[in-house]
Amino acid sequence: MAPRDIAQLGSADALGALGRGFESCYPDIMELNRRYFGKTIVFCLPGSHYSGRFLVRFTQLLLDCRQIGINTIISQDYSSMVNYARCKVMGANVTRGKYQVPFGGAIEYDYMMWIDSDIAFTSADFFKLLEQDRDIVSGWYIQPGGLTPIVEKMDDEYFKSHGYFEFISEDAMSKRNSLFKADYVGFGWVLIKRGVFESISYPWFAPKLIKIGEDLEDVCSEDVSFCIDAKNAGYDIWVDPKIRVGHEKVLTI
């Protein structure tokens, strides 16, 4: 067997804060309890397997939610087709038609928190998203190559010159301090309020054929497709540059 290790793409804060304790980041537990007691979060976990590291982080997050009175629901599923996997996580059923709602309306919830299986996070990272009180809000992480999965503006002219949209670099993101709007965010670490998916027709993550100018066409991924539909439905997509999580990748050496 070839030796393997985990390459963790992320800041020391995102990857090392697990042992510091939830209370050290949020000393006023009673204030969090006052704001969010009785709220219900559906944690959406698409994927086929999860590391021991993920299990420890996620278990701690569930315990911290319970400590302040947040109800939690876990929805997990998998398909080799990522767009279908995400719809399965939301309890979709093609026989319900294009106007169906998540989980067939059987689950009352306030937020969906989407977490990919290779994200390294802390409870504090989650509660910082929650406190932004936005319909759609994301943190950020690094992809192999040093870019984030975030496009602030899907500029057609840039696409014509490069063959892809301009992703924000790690360096550029690290220099930002304020919440900002984006045209596209990856779905590895994003919080979405109830009402957003309910206002978008099924299938919520169907890849789209997009046209760039007169003669360029491309097929966008499932998360790009959702972002396009959400913006067309009138929702802003927000990014908090102060919420950086880690990104684990398996490395053969």
Model-derived features with residue positions:
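Catalytic donor-sugar/metal-binding loop of nucleotide-sugar-dependent glycosyltransferases
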Residues: 181, 194, 199-206, 211-247, ...
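Short beta-strand-to-loop acidic/aromatic patch adjacent to the donor-nucleotide binding site
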Residues: 98-120
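Conserved catalytic core of nucleotide-sugar-dependent glycosyltransferases
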Residues: 90, 122-209
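Residue-level detector of anion-binding/catalytic polar loops
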Residues: 71, 118, 135, 236, ...
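Short, conserved alpha-helix that lines the donor NDP-sugar binding/gating region
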Residues: 82-105, 228
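Short, positively charged low-complexity motifs
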Residues: 1-3, 8, 21
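N-proximal low-complexity "stem/linker" segments adjacent to membrane-targeting elements
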Residues: 30-81
